Swiss-Prot record:
This is Protein phosphatase 2C homolog 3. Residues 354-383, 427-468 are annotated as: Disordered. It catalyses: O-phospho-L-seryl-[protein] + H2O = L-seryl-[protein] + phosphate; O-phospho-L-threonyl-[protein] + H2O = L-threonyl-[protein] + phosphate. Binds 2 magnesium or manganese ions per subunit. The gene is PTC3. Residues 357-366, 437-450 have a biased composition (Acidic residues). It comes from Saccharomyces cerevisiae (strain ATCC 204508 / S288c) (Baker's yeast).
Length: 468
């Protein structure tokens, strides 16, 4: 399961936005893990407003062995996509394959990242207004699900080493599957990065032990039936089936007072383990994006009204689902206490009286492009030697991290990721306590990778296309 904290970091990134094609609400939380290794993209329109076409692009990237590759994907993938000739030619399916391959190539060109040992999953969607088309590209075990008529439809499938098609490629490339892991190490069979598993110079990118080449699934949009898309990392899918997640979104919509950001946040609450006991599910980083599919000239509020008018009979609630997932835990009869681990005030979570060592936590929803500031310690500013008790309090309670959207040289400001303040504090605390740096940062998908000397820019990829 990897190393975990004594208390989860519960401060959440919230992002939301809308235009004429889609609306979205995203929530990401570090949770029980020692660091945040997820990243994401939310871009309602890739093109200029004057263009005839309108393309929305969303993505979730779940890192393992570190956050570097996931962060690179989040900050660079849009600019990489726009440079592809297939994108300029309107070949949307091929451009996603080309983009994944080119991202691996660009990683190897980066002096700071070419020797990095991390990798990440990638599940992304393009929504085309002109073609009325939803396209999903997926590598790894993050997942994309479409809600259509209240039912879940898989827009991706998890790439696990035990799948016959994946195992055949692994073995043909002189790899092996042991304990359901690639070479006994990596728990997924496709990923961006992870160059240790892509070092066979005699094979193309699509033939390597681990490949970044995505599967492509296309869906012709019917706006009377197709409602929203969910993209999430395995921290969510380890706890919920696709249908259960769709049902929870519909349940949130039916409440009448929840935004998409609110619903995504509550789903994270549902999936965060109340304790580190049990099987380990609910102790991972969590990221989820809910993308509403808007009809022509439909506003987000009108979309909500249309969804509620469908009157689905949802036989679940956030509380019921949480209790079902963690049935080993003795929850309070008070439903307000069911989500205590992610909602309780700091002083309650630490079981301490209010004093100057407490830290006020808020959880504001920030729109795209808005600025935010870190939470501050209450009381007077502190100087002098490190107060280990205060550090432990910060680590156990979580730290509110706020950032402006990052911007790269291409002007892409759609990518956000958590700051590393918690990592710094953990390092300071361990150093002061005489502890050594953890030597095993493994994830459910952890592995180390090495630079691959060559990565051919092949155009091959699996494709599953629905014929409607």
């Amino acid at each position: 399961m990897g190393q975990i904290l004594s208390n989860p970091i519960i401060d959440k990134e919230h992002h939301s936005g809308t235009d004429c094609l889609t609306a979205f609400g995203l929530c990401a939380m570090q949770g029980w893990r020692m660091s945040m290794e997820d990243a994401h993209i939310v871009e309602p329109n890739l093109l200029a407003e004057s263009d005839e076409e309108h393309l929305a692009f969303y993505g979730i990237f779940d890192g393992h062995g570190g956050s570097s590759v996931a962060e690179f994907c989040g900050s660079k993938m849009i600019s990489i996509l726009k440079k592809q000739e297939s994108f300029k030619s309107g070949m949307l399916e091929q451009c996603l394959i080309d983009t994944f391959l080119a991202t691996d190539v660009e990683l190897l060109k980066d002096e700071k990242l070419k020797d990095d040992h991390s990798g990440c999953t990638a599940t992304v969607i393009l929504v085309s207004q002109l073609k009325k088309l939803l396209i999903c590209a997926n590598s790894g075990d993050s997942r994309t699900v479409l809600s259509t008529g209240g039912n879940s439809k898989a827009m991706s499938f998890d790439h696990k080493p035990t799948l016959l098609s994946e195992k055949s490629r692994i073995v043909a490339a002189d790899g092996f599957v042991e304990m359901d892991r690639v070479n006994g190490n990596l728990a997924l069979s496709r990923a961006i990065g992870d160059f240790e598993f892509k070092s066979n110079t005699k094979l193309g990118p699509h033939e390597q032990v681990v490949t970044c080449v995505p599967d492509i699934i296309c869906h012709n949009l019917n706006y009377d039936e197709d409602e929203f898309v969910i993209l999430a990392c395995d921290g969510i899918w380890d706890c919920l089936t696709s249908q259960e997640c769709v049902d929870l979104v519909h349940y949130g919509i039916s409440q009448g007072n929840m935004t998409l950001s609110d619903i995504s946040s509550r789903i994270v609450d549902v999936c965060c383990s109340p304790t580190t006991e049990g099987s380990g599910i609910g102790c991972d980083n969590m990221s989820i994006s809910i993308v509403a599919l808007l009809k022509e000239n439909e506003s987000e509020s009108q979309w909500f009204e249309r969804m509620r008018s469908k009157n689905y009979n949802i036989q679940t609630s956030f509380v019921q689902r949480r209790k079902s997932i963690f049935d080993f835990h003795d929850f309070s009869d008070d439903d307000n206490e069911v989500f205590a681990i992610t909602t309780k005030k700091l002083q309650d979570r630490l079981n301490r009286s209010k004093d100057n060592d407490d830290m006020e936590i808020d959880d504001l929803d920030t729109e795209l492009g808005s600025s935010a500031t870190p939470s501050k310690l209450s009381g007077e500013d502190r100087t002098g030697p490190i107060d280990l008790f205060s550090l432990e309090a910060l680590l156990e309670a979580g730290i509110q991290i706020r950032q402006r959207p990052s911007s790269d040289s291409d002007g892409n400001t759609s990518y956000f990721h958590g700051a590393s303040l918690s990592d710094m504090l953990a390092s300071l605390s361990n150093a002061a306590a005489g502890e050594t740096e953890p030597n095993d940062a493994d994830d459910n998908d952890d592995n180390d990778g090495e630079e691959n000397g060559k990565n051919e820019n092949a155009k091959k990829g699996s494709k599953i296309e629905e014929i409607e």
